[in-house]
């Protein structure tokens, strides 16, 4: 391809400020003419011949001035600016907390390229027209495999897991703090939204509930302990349709987790069940709560009630727990699910969940009537969900 001569604009004051010297325009033009650059004082530009491919901008013209003026004549100056003590930003401290939790669960950090292939969307079964397919194309890519900027961290995570699986590593847990790049529109008219996403991936020992437990540990460390639900309604084509959930708080999606769709696993040559989770780090930082208040050792005994509930299979445990949390009042101290049953003793489309609920008062020993009143309130609210005590 034939190269055409170009004109590079110059500014005498900027060149002098850049070099820290005081040279006149006439002297600069003389220097440029000595190397076959043709200055035009009227247009304030320099005509650059085709064989000078190294002259592209003002800094390149300044370099020519510096060479002829003499590097030894340029005065030395100390860097100027304010000296600060420094510190760790809020976002960085959040990331460090997350790393500490994840690594305690046996995960190792990985780093993958932000550039990837458009074929990744097909491997992930992402539908045509999906927002994730609106990726920024690289103007000078190394090749088609690195020609777009990623919009999801899953391709890099699954590729890393696949590499480990093909090297016969039997039990692998990886995580990555991965930036994704989401353009408002294409072609670009302004900078894309750059979001940091936490991607978790594992195969081998562990299942969906192990991954969910790791996510819960992260949320707990950040003080995000109430109002979090797991709703199996997210439209994630790359996840198993019956083993996935959106992580919700205040009707806002914090992320998602689930088992990788079998077809997607085959596309990445993963011959075993694989589990992933993706969390929006910015939203975690926004929801984090470190307002921890000291509570003294309880002076009065707790009262525990175990209940077994029967309901339709479509009712979520999160819905049950939300009712317990909201109806338990000040006496509610803790609750946990300890049994799930499906079988002959309940209906075909029903299931049974058993909860242990603990109550305690700060100023007195609870009587049976106190606890019964709260339990009646909880059970009455559960009736609105079609939930009843198991007989």
Regions found by a protein language model. Name each.
Residues 8-170, 305, 358-360, 366, ...:
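Extended, well-folded interaction surfaces typified by the phenylalanyl-tRNA synthetase beta subunit core
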Residues 1-7, 45-51, 79-84, 112-125, ...:
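A glycine-rich phosphate-binding loop feature that marks nucleotide/adenosyl-phosphate handling sites
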Residues 2-8, 53-71, 128, 179-186, ...:
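Core structural elements
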């Amino acid at each position: 391809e034939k190269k055409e001569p170009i004109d590079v604009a110059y500014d005498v004051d900027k060149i002098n400020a850049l070099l820290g010297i005081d040279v006149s325009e006439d002297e600069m033009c003389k220097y440029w003419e000595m190397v076959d650059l043709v200055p035009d004082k009227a247009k304030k530009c320099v005509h650059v011949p085709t064989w000078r491919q190294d002259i592209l901008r003002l800094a390149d013209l300044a370099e020519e001035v510096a060479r002829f003026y003499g590097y030894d004549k340029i005065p030395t100056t100390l860097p100027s600016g304010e000296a600060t003590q420094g510190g760790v930003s809020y976002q960085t401290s959040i990331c460090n907390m997350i790393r500490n939790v994840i690594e305690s669960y046996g995960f190792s950090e990985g780093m993958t390229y932000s550039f990837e292939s458009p074929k990744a969307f097909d491997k992930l079964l992402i539908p045509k027209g999906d927002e994730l397919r609106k990726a920024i194309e690289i103007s000078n890519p190394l090749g088609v495999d690195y020609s777009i900027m990623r919009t999801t961290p899953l391709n890099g995570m699954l590729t890393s897991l696949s590499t480990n699986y093909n090297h016969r590593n039997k039990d692998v847990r990886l995580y990555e703090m991965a930036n994704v790049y989401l353009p408002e529109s294409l072609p670009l008219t302004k900078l894309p939204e750059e979001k940091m996403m936490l991607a978790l991936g594992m195969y081998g020992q562990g299942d969906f509930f192990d991954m969910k437990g790791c996510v819960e540990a992260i949320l707990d460390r950040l003080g995000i302990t109430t109002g979090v639900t797991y709703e199996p309604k997210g439209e994630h084509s790359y996840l198993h349709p019956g083993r996935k959930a959106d992580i919700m708080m205040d009707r806002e999606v914090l992320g998602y987790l689930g088992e990788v769709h079998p077809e997607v696993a085959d596309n990445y040559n993963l011959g075993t069940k694989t589990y992933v989770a993706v969390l929006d780090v910015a939203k975690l930082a926004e929801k984090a709560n470190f307002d921890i208040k000291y509570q003294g050792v309880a002076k009065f005994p707790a009262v525990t009630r175990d209940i077994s509930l029967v309901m339709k299979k479509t009712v979520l445990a999160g819905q049950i727990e939300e009712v317990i949390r909201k109806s338990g009042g000040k006496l509610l101290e803790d609750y946990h699910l300890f049994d799930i049953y499906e079988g002959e003793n309940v209906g075909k489309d029903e299931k049974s969940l058993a909860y242990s609920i603990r109550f305690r008062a700060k100023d007195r020993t609870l009587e049976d009537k106190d606890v019964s009143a709260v339990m009646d309130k909880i059970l009455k609210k559960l009736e609105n969900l079609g939930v009843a005590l198991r007989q």
